[in-house]
């Protein structure tokens, strides 16, 4: 059956209007292709149908640059959405939004390809996540534990360490977990994707990872859809092979940003702060597909850029509703040189529940937050009147809070070359034990510096003894 053809009517940046003959209008979300277009016949471009305008015209979003495209060019209707290869042949390879390889190693010969637009699992098939996923990062495992098969958000402004955290989590979870992982680079720096690829080769895990990139330099159409490409690959492993898959997305804000860029060109009236009016719908469509079913699970870790450090901005605020755990990276913590710069009072998790993590873990976590909250309340008094005006009880709380703050830091594997400190993976049981001992006052005699950038409490005690020996 021959492909219906249309003609380009108008080109507005990343948006292209196409006219088709009567009775051959392509469906929404179907892919249209331009073959050997442009003056030199060197343009091969995929468009996705976004709107029906009437008069047999459709408005489409381009998945690549429209430079050199001309009105009147022939457009072919593929009569299907964008389809991408899935299954084990995709592992160890790098793809673009269309499922084409971009690592210079030739095409992928996968017997199965799936459309990137799919329905989320039905309510009866969804399996709620209630098991903790150890990350080896103390502040996360203690205060905002991640659920296996859950959705996790890393919130932070510019330059507070979201990508480093994603890379550390890939190191700690993907390498130890041993299952398959999908990494979707959405609108971020190409350099970071390149670094990650080479790190995975060095670590010997590249054959268990598929990487999909639609980076900063690409048109908004590619950045809008690349997360769906990565998700489709993850869904196949979950649904057809019954596996537990890890899906890393860096950065989900760029997905929203790309939608915002395209929205105005599509003629939609902008909503709050200039975002697209369909923001909640687009986010829900993506997030509802990232879930655990009776067959397998997708555990997703999503970095979320927070514009101007404002968590009430519509883009991060819309994402909040979908997450099981939120890890908030704070500039105030970053300025204290505590890394990872996780805000222990803002970060939350649905599974920080005594029935899931255990009574001891829950009580230690709440005890830590209580001490840190009291310290935060006392900071104004300390700033105005000084420490001497505090009661003995408050002085003790301040001393323990400062130790807890420092003990929430730890050396990271992916930052070894910058810090010259070997990275550590701390078992959640050791994390709970360490903070419990600080809360009980067992280490009140040690200097607070002993707790900075160490793994377990035993390492802190050893470091403290060395510091005391140097002083004496």
Curated annotation (Swiss-Prot):
It catalyses: ATP + H2O + 4 H(+)(in) = ADP + phosphate + 5 H(+)(out). Its EC number is 7.1.2.2. It is a peripheral membrane protein. Its main location: membrane. F-type ATPases have 2 components, CF(1) - the catalytic core - and CF(0) - the membrane proton channel. CF(1) has five subunits: alpha(3), beta(3), gamma(1), delta(1), epsilon(1). CF(0) has three main subunits: a(1), b(2) and c(9-12). The alpha and beta chains form an alternating ring which encloses part of the gamma chain. CF(1) is attached to CF(0) by a central stalk formed by the gamma and epsilon chains, while a peripheral stalk is formed by the delta and b chains. This is ATP synthase subunit beta. SMART domains: AAA (SM00382). InterPro entries: AAA+_ATPase, ATP-synt_VA_C, ATP_synth_F1_bsu, ATPase_a/bsu_AS, ATPase_alpha/beta_chains, ATPase_F1/V1/A1_a/bsu_N, ATPase_F1/V1/A1_a/bsu_N_sf, ATPase_F1/V1/A1_a/bsu_nucl-bd. Keywords: ATP synthesis, ATP-binding, Cell membrane, CF(1), Hydrogen ion transport, Ion transport, Membrane, Nucleotide-binding, Translocase, Transport. The keyword Nuclease does not apply. It is found in: Cell membrane. GO terms for cellular component: plasma membrane; proton-transporting ATP synthase complex. One of its GO terms (molecular function) is proton-transporting ATP synthase activity, rotational mechanism. ATP binds at residues 156-163. It is an enzyme of class 7 (translocase). Produces ATP from ADP in the presence of a proton gradient across the membrane. The catalytic sites are hosted primarily by the beta subunits. Belongs to the ATPase alpha/beta chains family.
